Amino acid sequence: MSTNSFAYPPMSPYLTVKDANKAIEFYKAAFGATEIFRLTDASTGAVGHVELMVNGSHIMLADENPAWGNKSPLSLGGTAVSFSLMVENADTAAERASAAGATVEMPPTDMFYGFRSASISDPFGHKWMLQHQIENVSHEEMQKRWDAMLASGDTGCPSSDK
């Protein structure tokens, strides 16, 4: 019998998805996730709880279950949350996620805050920023760059037409 010896971090995201089994496979393919453990309803195959590690981060997820108040972004019509995932190379990470089925919303771009960032939507309605640092930028310099960007009419999002 195995025991639960995992040291939980102070905060872990808990994602609700439609078809958790497919989501688990997507996160493995897109982000190199490793599965810690899974609780499955033997009668339906539904995932009641699974824990994954993604690049050193602990993520939990479960199948949508409206009876428990768990609805996925697909059922809600979107999400107000975006996850920031630090990666070795944003270009490679975005390509890998796209190959696994993600939609690239913003291609890898050098950003004013000193990161190269890409924005993706996964097939389950969750949004992710894949990024790596390309330069050290002080808070003061970041504010100057932000002000200049806004003054120029730039939205800061290369995929935006606004």
Q: Which sequence ranges carry the predicted segments?
A:
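Vicinal oxygen chelate
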Residues: 1-14, 24-25, 31-121, 132-162
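Short acidic-aromatic low-complexity motifs
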Residues: 17-21
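C-terminal catalytic core of tyrosine-transesterase DNA break-rejoin enzymes
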Residues: 124
